[in-house]
Amino acid sequence: MKVQRPNRRQTVLGVTVLAAIGIVFMGTQTRPFEGQWARLTGADPDRRIVVSLDDRRLWLLQGRDTIFTAPVAVGSGQTFEFNGRTYRFETPRGTRRVLARADDPNWTPPDWHYYEKAALRSLTPVHIEPGEEYPLSDGSHLEVRGEDVGRVNQYGNFYAWTPGMELIFDGKIYIPPFGTRQRMVPNVLGPHKLVLGDGYLIHGVHDLNETSIGSAASHGCIRMNNDDLRYLYALVATGTRVDIF
């Protein structure tokens, strides 16, 4: 397992970082709210995650001590405009909490994921709605049955579409509804995820984006090497404070 222990520069930088956000030189004393949250969630009130967007680095702290540090990828800061709406892909600064943890997570893409695909390939996005049929040029059609989006042939046979594969037909990209298996993409978030709320995660990498670590490259999530994430995940409970600056 690749564990990155902090070197002197990273430790000094970490102290500077913590001082800047007001959580160093306080010893192990915690605010009343911190203690209440810890009792409710089981999180250690003196343990927290700090992320520097400029340095693209994460620290796990126990009081004043740095337990672990690792490089991360953060939001690119780029904007994307589609159908009169602007999306900005940045990691928001501020204080959050680890709201949930999950092993072997699937990714549920937001609408902008499909809009990006549509813009890149000059496709028309179509949102699939339960109870509707979407005819295709070969005589088949798409529809929702239970938790699946699938293709129905001329004989009425239903074939569920493979999760993670885009539904692209006849110059259109069909967007599966939330709650269907086809809206969930496997094997792109690494071995674990830490949920920070509002769609933001700390997660791992797919083989295709391993080289992004240490850069501003994500759509807003904090991305780590998978070995680093495994180490962090084992030490972080639901309710842990996350300071992003």
Regions found by a protein language model. Give the residues of each.
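N-terminal pre-domains immediately preceding structured catalytic cores
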Residues: 1-245
